[in-house]
Amino acid sequence: MGLSRRKVLAGGGTALGTFLIGGRWVDASPKTARELGFTPQVLTAAQCEALEVTGDALVPGALKAGLAPFIDSQLALGSGSKLIAKYLGVDPLGQQSFYRAIADNLIINLAHPDTTAEQLTGSMASDSVSEWAGPPASYAFFVLRADALDVTYGTPEGFAALNIPYSAHIQPETSW
């Protein structure tokens, strides 16, 4: 049986991925990849930063949990990606363009000196972002929040942070 999103989440949330760190390919969790300074393969550093800042405003802890490495590594898988957008009607082969468009919109809007990530997410939720092109802002809000939740709380450690017993249908083989 192939790897499914359900299997990834049941197996500890964010499965280990392969990340370029310091010029070497390393198997690591998104959190570790971020801590070690991963090099994005699909998104730019600016796009990663915009997704992380906004994702962390939606789900505190998402930045530290490795939201950008998680999204970037999944986008690098093409049709094998397990990002939620795939299950919400975004063609797996079009996910890179979808996430780039979201990130580019975030970059433009976060560049305004009087705009915080928290203010921007509020505007995204109501589709009232003045400078937004591409996927609807509320849809981007939903997708980014779901990805941030997956990487932050889709692990045994995430459940512990919520003081919820971790009861996976399939226990992960290893913890990270």
What residue spans do the PLM features occupy?
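Short alpha-helical "patches" and their helix-cap loops
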Residues: R5, G66-Q74, F159-H169
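Sec-dependent signal peptide hydrophobic core
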Residues: G12-L16
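Long, amphipathic alpha-helical surface segments
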Residues: S130-W176
